[in-house]
Amino acid sequence: MKRSDRYKTYNKPNDSNDSNQLHHNTYFKPVNKPQKKKKGKGIILKLLIPILIIIGIIIGVMYALSLRADTDELKNITEKESFVYASDMRDYTKGAFIAMEDERFYKHHGFDVKGTSRALFSTLSDKSVQGGSTITQQVVKNYYYDNEQSITRKIKELFVAHRVEKEYDKNEILSFYMNNIYYGSDQYTIESAANHYFGVTTDKNNPNLPQISVLQSAILASKINAPSVYNINDMSDNFTNRVKTDLEKMKQQGYISNSQYENAIQELGV
C-alpha cells in the first residue's frame, strides 16, 4: 500500500463516531419541552389578572359606599336615658361580653383577620352570613347596617370599623356596643336589661340599686346571641351551657378569680 493511501485510511471519517454524534444530539432534543409549562403559567396569569381587577373594583366601590356612614353619629347612643359608660361598670361585667364576643378586643384595630376570614369563608360556602365579627364590627352593623345581610355589607363593615377605631378609644366603643344591642323584652341597653331582669344596676357609682353580679353579667352577655329564644326565668340546657362557657372564658382571660368562678357556677346550679 502506498504511503499516501495509508494516510487516507488513517484520516478517513469514522462512521461510528458520526452515528454516536447523531445519537448524542437526538438525546438532548427534549430539553425544549418545558416551554409548555411557561404557556400554562401564562394562561393562568391571563385568567387571574381580570379576576383581581374585578375584586379590586368591588372593594373600591364598597369603600366609597362605606364613607356614607357618619361615625360621629355613634355619639347619639350616649343620649339614651339608661346609658352607662363602660368605664363606670365592673370589670367582670365588661369582661363577660369581651370574653364571649371578642377576646382580642384590646389587641386588634377594628377587625380580627382570623375571625373575619373564617366568617367570609363560611359566608361563601354556606351562602349565608356567619359570625366572627369583632365588637367594633358589631357596633357598626347594629347602628348602620342592621337589616342588611350580604357579603358587601361585611366589606363595608370592615372599612367603617377601622374608622371607628381611629376616632374612638376602646372604652367608648365598648360603651356603644353594650348600650345598643338587643337583650330581649324590648331592652336595648345593658342597664335597662339589668334593671328589668334582675332589679340591679351596672353603674358602680349608683348607690340606689344592688350591683350586678358575675353570674348576672354572664347571663346577659350570653343572652344576646339569641335574645328572643333564651329565657332567663326558664333557662334551657343550651342557654345554661353557654353561660357556663362564658364564665370559663372569663376566668381564663383573667376577668374573674377562681373563687368568683366557683361561686357563679354554684349559683348557676351546674
UniProtKB/Swiss-Prot annotation:
Residues 1-35 are annotated as: Disordered. It is a single-pass membrane protein. Belongs to the glycosyltransferase 51 family. SUPFAM superfamilies: Lysozyme-like. The gene is mgt. Its EC number is 2.4.99.28. NCBIfam families: PRK13481.1 (NF010008). Pathway: Cell wall biogenesis; peptidoglycan biosynthesis. One of its GO terms (biological process) is cell wall organization. The chain crosses the membrane at residues 47-67. One of its GO terms (molecular function) is peptidoglycan glycosyltransferase activity. It catalyses: [GlcNAc-(1->4)-Mur2Ac(oyl-L-Ala-gamma-D-Glu-L-Lys-D-Ala-D-Ala)](n)-di-trans,octa-cis-undecaprenyl diphosphate + beta-D-GlcNAc-(1->4)-Mur2Ac(oyl-L-Ala-gamma-D-Glu-L-Lys-D-Ala-D-Ala)-di-trans,octa-cis-undecaprenyl diphosphate = [GlcNAc-(1->4)-Mur2Ac(oyl-L-Ala-gamma-D-Glu-L-Lys-D-Ala-D-Ala)](n+1)-di-trans,octa-cis-undecaprenyl diphosphate + di-trans,octa-cis-undecaprenyl diphosphate + H(+). It comes from Staphylococcus saprophyticus subsp. saprophyticus (strain ATCC 15305 / DSM 20229 / NCIMB 8711 / NCTC 7292 / S-41). Keywords: Cell membrane, Cell shape, Cell wall biogenesis/degradation, Glycosyltransferase, Membrane, Peptidoglycan synthesis, Transferase, Transmembrane, Transmembrane helix. It is found in: Cell membrane. Peptidoglycan polymerase that catalyzes glycan chain elongation using lipid-linked disaccharide-pentapeptide as the substrate. This is Monofunctional glycosyltransferase. Gene3D superfamilies: Biosynthetic peptidoglycan transglycosylase-like. Residues 11-24 have a biased composition (Polar residues).
